[in-house]
Amino acid sequence: MIATAQKLIPLYNNNEVKGSIPCNRKEKIDTSGGRIHISHVTEPSLTIYRPANINKTRSAVIVCPGGSYINLSMTHEGYDVAKELNKYGITAFVLKYRLPNDSCMQSKEIGPLQDIQQAIILVKTHAKEWGIDSSKLGVLGFSAGGHLVSTSLTHFNTCYADNPLDISVRPAFGVLIYPVISFQEEIAHAFSRGNLLGKKPAQEKMDLFSNEKQVTPQTPPCFLVHAEDDKTVPVKNSIRFYEALVDNKIKAEMLIYQSGGHGFGLVNPSTKETWMDKVILWLQLNGFYQPDK
């Protein structure tokens, strides 16, 4: 099953974003190396990838590329992933989210979270039109995009987006690929932390956005992927989050590769197996996906 032509839609009507500040930043697109990297995002959007056939699985995933909260790796952590999900009959939405910036946001640590919550609201609002079951809408993120996903999985009780219909912003499940999870000094990815919270954040704020500390019995089920030799984001980020999930009796599975480093996207070069196949089996096990036979 292949993807249909994608469609890009603005995340907000007329780009009217609560808590935003008018600024002169212009979006930058870098295509060097054959991949698209976007920075200075001020007009967030969703790019919809729908399966070629009617989405009989009715499953959907919002994909959040990584980039240390300073840019977005849109190709190998976004568009390529959406196309792969389409092969399984899953509708995918690649989220181009705003990156933290004091000149454009009243609270820069809230901007990305507000965008993923708005994306969830938007998809659920159009669920019938797009052939989606809202109870099968999950989130998937890489690196700093994994931090954003883990934040959406643990901070859903407060909605920062306009939500007049009081639509739940709790994802059904989360898939986290070499994610930034913790902002605690010993395992933090300092660059992502600094971009989101500033150079010298208070311990209270670091704790709030160290999402292993925010897991509760209401946190959605999760699948984690990491490489043991990741020198950029230590594997203990995933391990601590997994332990918190287990402590709270949340359904969870974790795949730790012996090697592979950081930023490998869909394919870990150290192995012929793919983590996506394992994710699909896990989704099926937990009732979030039924193959289109």
Identify the role of each PLM range:
Residues K28-G33, P179-Q214, P220:
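Mobile cap/lid helix-loop segments that gate and shape the active-site cleft of serine hydrolases
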Residues V235, I239-K293:
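C-terminal catalytic histidine-bearing segment of alpha/beta-hydrolase fold enzymes
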Residues M74-F93:
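Short amphipathic alpha-helix adjacent to the substrate-entry channel of hydrolases
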